[in-house]
Amino acid sequence: MQSVYFNRSPRFIRWIVLLAIVILPQAASAQWHATVGAQSANMGRQALAFLPNEIWIHEGDTITWKFNAGEIHTVSFLATSPTAQLRPAFSDGCPGFSSDPAWFDGSACVSTPPLVKGSTFTVRFPAAGNFKLVCLVHPDMTGVVHVLELSKPLPHTQYFYDEEAEAQTRALLSDSDREDNEDGLSAVHHSDEGQVIVGGGEISTNPGGASTLSIMRFVGHTPVIHAGQTVEWGTDDPEDPHTITFGTEPAGDPFPPSGNVTMDADGARHAIINSTSDSVHSGFIFAAPQDRTGLVQSPLSVTRFRVTFTHPGTYPYICALHDTLGMKGKVVVLP
């Protein structure tokens, strides 16, 4: 038996070596986990953030992101070499969307389509480098993945990142600088007409990038007005667009207003509703993007929408982008 064993040992050793070549790189790579987005129990507060938004890993490691919110997000890495890629629209992707799992080394774009709670996406990083992570839906939602050579020590464990993600989530969702209750009307609105604040939010940064709290609610008492009066909606959200939509939602692109919307002299959009069966869509109202040195300044955006109600009734409306998160309201019109 002993002689048979040694006669076969060279072949046996060769098989061991081959198996080691295949298995050891996989065994050496680590699997890391992070999350995308977070939300309050009623979905009214949305954390537009990668949690955590800064991770150190080794080359060959993978990260799996789990989507934890009803608001749409993407996990996207844009190409950086040989030249930096222009930022695409979230609906276009790289163009196109990546298979899962994906590989990223900076030479070609990787992006998910817009995803929501329950989805996951995994990326393997085969080469060392510092790679910016972005959400193509939300400009102020960024992060960074530091991919180190195998010889370099990692500063943190998965436990650290789990704790950091929980702490960042609590900090964003419990932000007390803003109140999203029914009495939280801002003092900057001076009109005597009914006022509704559309959304709200706050952008914060840390060494890893930017995160945003977004309030997916119409803030303020349900307007109670008389026939012939006007209600004005004004956006306080620094990041997300919203709509004010009465009746049937428009088919197709929700960006433009419906055909029965006009523009006032101050740039606000305006519509007249004569019946509870009328359909009116504001189109997107949103804050203008931040100006940047060396680029043409951003044009003014549409931040207000007004509706004049000619007849009594109760008029329900929604944000066509975020109604599934509970962003709904109504206007009560008395004689």
Task: Locate the predicted segments by residue.
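Extracytoplasmic copper-binding redox domains, predominantly the cupredoxin/blue-copper superfamily
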Residues: S29-P335
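Bacterial N-terminal signal peptides
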Residues: R14-P25
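N-terminal secretory signal peptides that target proteins for export/translocation
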Residues: M1-R11
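Extreme N-terminus of proteins, especially the signal/transit-peptide cleavage junction
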Residues: N7, Q26-A30
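Prokaryotic Sec-type signal peptides and long signal-anchor helices
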Residues: P10, I16, A288-Q290
